[in-house]
Amino acid sequence: MENTLEKKWVEDIEYLKEELKKRHNNLFAYTAEESFNEKIENLKSMVNDLDYEEMKVEISRVVASLKDAHTSLIFPAKRFIPLKFYYFNEGVYIINTCKGYEKLLFKKVLALGDMKIEEVLEELSNIISFENEYFFKAQSMKYMQIAEVLYGLLIIDNMDKIKITLDEGEYEVSTCSFEDLVYTNERLPMYAKNDSENLWFEVLESGELYIKYNSCREQGEESIGKKIENILCLIEKKNIEKVTVDLRNNLGGDSTLFTPLIDYLKNSEKINKKENLKVIIGRETFSSALLNAYTFKNSTNAKIIGEPSGGKPNCYGEILRLTLPNSKLVITYSTRFYKLIEDDLVMALYPEEVLLESIEDYINL
């Protein structure tokens, strides 16, 4: 084989196989090594027949077959559908739009290209790394927005314009760059506001303190530690007795950043009561945010409400990255096993009170 594109892809695939085996904490915890090796060899034999977008999808398929939600291809994407999707119990709906597509807001999605939405989701389930259905519901909506993913899966044949069938008609949508992905609907549920801020808080009219924790990562000049100090000062100053901590959209980072707040709430006699302290979890509560949720569950009297978590309690995590030498595609992989509970078959943290949002709830919030 000459130094061709084919040879470079084969080198990358072989590198992926060998390096994951070397570096991952326990690569074959959920799938057989023979099955993985077979998928690798199959992919090598296909390189001549696949274009770049299809190769990305097929590498993602191999990595997703390991069934470790922390081990995945970071999908390089340049073209996006200018619509934000959400997977409700009633189906997939558009919950936000970019300029020019406002009339599609809150419509139900029936098909992309010529493929029914149920089949699109089935295709996506084979290339996304997830451990439970709740995380898939979250991740699939992000992948569904990426034109390169849909093209690589042969769902569409044009990455610039995409046909989308809604419950009241068919539309052609032009894709856009990430920079142009600016949503226009400002009538959002409170939890969906300030979604780019790692930690924010607000005293509600009822006097309850609402704390939204979106990311266990530092951001900007004000540290999470400083923000927590401000929260504690506010609680003392206003003599707050009821607190809701919302972790529903937190995909993780460093679980220790939130410890000072959890410790304070744990030691507060007036707040640390089931009727006064609530923690909201959901399909995007994952990794370090799930560790925080379990700390609340195990060391406070908080009532856990919301949807089951996207993260599995016992899981592999603490990710590092490897870069394929030729294509420069990046794959995350797990370096540590977290055992939070005895029963490894429990797939999520299940709330005491399940709150499943319908499209009507979302519109009327």
Predicted segments, located by residue:
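Flexible, low-complexity junctional segments that flank or bridge functional domains
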Residues: 1-242
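C-terminal "post-core" interaction segments
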Residues: 3-17, 197-365
